[in-house]
């Protein structure tokens, strides 16, 4: 069973979130069984059935910027060292002990100093040192706001030259519509073609051309007297003139050669 001890600054919210995300992604791939976060000592203990060297290299590649150190251990926490026993005291040899003196010339031991009756030190009324405040958690950086869109440019007024001063009042100075372009002049009418000579020898009446069609019947009685069809009425009927009177008998006439010889 492999054990990794990763040293990371868990007080930093970004480092904490980064190492949790990386270990969460590698949990199934490397069979990580247990992950312990020691916030006080800034350590992360990873346990599981994995190759510690391969997992160590993978974590360095994924989160190398926030990791301070990675240790590969067999047992965690490490066993405490045995307490140090003081060396046994050597007994002084008996020969070194001073022997009591039985003579009267020995000096008497000095008297013990009397206890001091001075005033006891007054207790200190200073303020106790306050514990260090924890740094505020790092706030995630806000994504940069997109730059505000520029307003569309205002339409520029085109200045048109005009005579100065302008006569007053001058209606429609700016409201006049755009003048229409001049129309092209109309084409001149075509001259009718002259009639072509038919080339026939009839002097008075030409038979080369077909006769015009007869006028349509107007449906009137035929007299065209009070008809509104626009056709002139027929001329009135005229009786034949009376025969010429024979010449008087006294008139001289030439003999008719064809007459009978008896007459």
UniProtKB/Swiss-Prot annotation:
Domain of life, source organism: Eukaryota
Gene Ontology MF terms in the entry: metal ion binding
Biased segments, Basic and acidic residues type: 139-153
Chain spans, region Disordered: 126-153
Alphabetical list of InterPro entries matching this protein: HMA_dom (IPR006121), PI21 (IPR044169)
Alphabetic keyword roster: Metal-binding, Plant defense
One example of a Gene Ontology biological process annotation: defense response to fungus
Residues engaged in binding a metal cation: 12, 15
Disruption phenotype: The pi21 allele confers an improved non-race-specific blast resistance toward Magnaporthe oryzae.
Entry keyword Metal-binding: yes
Protein name (record): Protein PYRICULARIA ORYZAE RESISTANCE 21
